[in-house]
Amino acid sequence: MKNWKTLLLGIAMIANTSFAAPQVVDKVAAVVNNGVVLESDVDGLMQSVKLNAGQAGQQLPDDATLRHQILERLIMDQIILQMGQKMGVKITDEQLDQAIANIAKQNNMTMDQMRSRLAYDGLNYSTYRNQIRKEMIISEVRNNEVRRRITVLPQEVDALAKQIGTQNDASTELNLSHILIALPENPTSEQVNDAQRQAESIVEEARNGADFGKLAITYSADQQALKGGQMGWGRIQELPGIFAQALSTAKKGDIVGPIRSGVGFHILKVNDLRGQSQSISVTEVHARHILLKPSPIMNDQQARLKLEEIAADIKSGKTTFAAAAKEYSQDPGSANQGGDLGWATPDIFDPAFRDALTKLHKGQISAPVHSSFGWHLIELLDTRKVDKTDAAQKDRAYRMLMNRKFSEEAATWMQEQRASAYVKILSN
C-alpha cells in the first residue's frame, strides 16, 4: 500500500495510468506560458481516468466536471515540466527502467505481464514510458523546489520526539481521502464565505452517504482529485498540524472538516485505521578489516591472493589480525587501530562488505571480499542489541516534520506557480 506522502508528490505509480494512443496534431485546449495542452492530452487522460475508475468501481462526475479537473491537472503538469526544462532536469533511461520495474513489482506483475496488460487496456507502452518520465521530472522539480523552502528546527524535532514517546496512539496509522476547496491568493471575504459554504455543503453530502471519491473528483482542487482524493496510509503526525488535531479522536468512516488553511478548506474521510508497533532495538556489529586497493602495481587477483596469504598467516598464528592490518591495510581511517571499525549498524557499510559481514559468526574471518573500495579481509568481533529509542524517535520526528511541512508547502508552492503562469483556456 502506498503511503500518502508519496502520493502527495503527484507520481501516478499505478500500472494502468497513462495517456492513450500516440497523439496527432489537433486542437489546443490551453496555452500555458510558451507551451500548450492539446485536446488529445485531455482525451487521453479522460480515457485513462475512466478506465481506472471502472476497474476500481469508482463513481465519476459528469464529463464536463471531469474534463475541468483533468485540464487543470494538465495545466499544472505543463507549468512544472517547463520549469524542469529550464532547470535542466533529466531522467535517464536507467532511472526510468528502474521506476517502471518498481511499478510492475508493486502491482505483482513481471515486465512482460505489464506490457500485456497495457496492450489489453489499449495503452501504448512507448507513450506510457514517456508519461512516467514526465511524472518523474514533475516529482523531482516539485521536491527540489518545495524542500528548499522548508526548515526543520532542532527544538521542533525534540518537542515532537517527546510527544511521540508519551502518546499512546503514536503508532496509529490512518487511511485518508481528501477534498480541497481552494481559495485564490489574498481572497476577499466573499470568496472565503463562498468556499466555506461549498465545503460545508460537501461535508453534509458526504455524511449523508454520498460517494466521497465522486465528490473529490467533482470538486477537489488537490492533485489527488482524479484518484478520488485517496491519500493512502500514513501516521497522524505526518499530517499538517491542523489535520492532526482534527483527527486525534477520529474513527473509521468519519468525515472531518471543513478545516481552513492558507490554501483553502479541507475535508477528510477516515477510510480505515490500524496500529503498527515499531521496533527501536537494533543490532550493531563490531568488526575489523584489512583493505587492499588494486593499483598499477597490484591487480585484483594479486590483491585477493595477498589477502588469502594474510588470512592463512593469522589462522596459523604467525601474525595477528591487528598487526597485519597495521602493516598492510590501505584504509587510513582504521589501519592504525588494527583495522578496528568500532560499533556500527551493518547498513552503513558498502553492500558487498555488509552482506559478507552479516554472514560471519563471532570470531570468524571472511574470505577476501570485493567492494567498491577494493578487497577486504573482515573479522566479526562481536554483535549486540542496542536500545535506540531516543535516536529512533528523533529520526521519526524529523521525517514526520519534513512530511508535514512538505504537504503544507507543496500546496502553497503549486498555487503560486499556477497564479504566476500565463494560462489561456481555449476550449470548454
UniProtKB/Swiss-Prot annotation:
Domain comment (free text): The PPIase activity resides only in the second parvulin domain. The N-terminal region and the C-terminal tail are necessary and sufficient for the chaperone activity of SurA. The PPIase activity is dispensable for SurA to function as a chaperone. The N-terminal region and the C-terminal tail are also required for porin recognition.
Gene Ontology BP annotations: chaperone-mediated protein folding; Gram-negative-bacterium-type cell outer membrane assembly; protein stabilization
Alphabetized UniProt keyword annotations: Chaperone, Isomerase, Periplasm, Repeat, Rotamase, Signal
InterPro entries to which the protein is assigned, alphabetical: OMP_Chaperone_SurA (IPR050280), PPIase_dom_sf (IPR046357), PPIase_PpiC (IPR000297), PPIase_PpiC_CS (IPR023058), PPIase_SurA (IPR023034), SurA_N (IPR015391), Trigger_fact/SurA_dom_sf (IPR027304)
Function: Chaperone involved in the correct folding and assembly of outer membrane proteins. Recognizes specific patterns of aromatic residues and the orientation of their side chains, which are found more frequently in integral outer membrane proteins. May act in both early periplasmic and late outer membrane-associated steps of protein maturation.
Molecular functions per Gene Ontology: peptide binding; peptidyl-prolyl cis-trans isomerase activity; unfolded protein binding
Record keyword Chaperone present: yes
Signal peptide region: 1-20
NCBIfam families: PRK10770.1
Annotated EC: 5.2.1.8
Record's keyword annotation contains Oxidoreductase: no
Domain PpiC: start-end pairs: 171-272, 282-382
Predominant localisation class: periplasm
Gene behind the chain: surA
PANTHER family noted in UniProt: CHAPERONE SURA (PTHR47637:SF1)
Record-annotated membrane-spanning stretches: none
The protein's name in its UniProt record: Chaperone SurA
Alphabetized Pfam families for the sequence: Rotamase, Rotamase_3, SurA_N
A cellular-component GO term for this protein: outer membrane-bounded periplasmic space
Location in the cell: Periplasm
Enzymatic reactions: [protein]-peptidylproline (omega=180) = [protein]-peptidylproline (omega=0)
Gene3D superfamilies, alphabetized: 3.10.50.40, Porin chaperone SurA, peptide-binding domain
